[in-house]
Amino acid sequence: DELDEINMGGPTRTLVFDLSELDNPQLHHVYNGVTRAIDHNGYIKDEFYYLANYTGGLRVINVNEIGNERMGEIGFFDTYPSDDKANFAGAWSVYPFFESGIIAINDINSGLFLVKAKNMEN
């Protein structure tokens, strides 16, 4: 799903599949983000999806209602503020699993960012 923003235009798109039957995966939901940046590595921790969004930086998406096909961005940290174009610059990966709540963002251009959310409510 990494090249759809370049080849087809449009916003960041995340495809959510129901894998309850491994022999018969079903497309459950399509989430369209708020930028045209390319989505890359994403990780779920609790009810949040932490997404490296290249030029869009880190995006934090609430997936608490994913079963009802509802996902919504609740925060972001832009490591590449000059633009949100669909190209391979900015945040390549994130790591939200530190017990301290710190989130590591690996940025291709600017190196390592360590951030911590003030409030993780909806």
Where do the model's predicted regions map?
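Feature marking well-ordered beta-strand scaffolds used for ligand recognition
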Residues: D1-N122
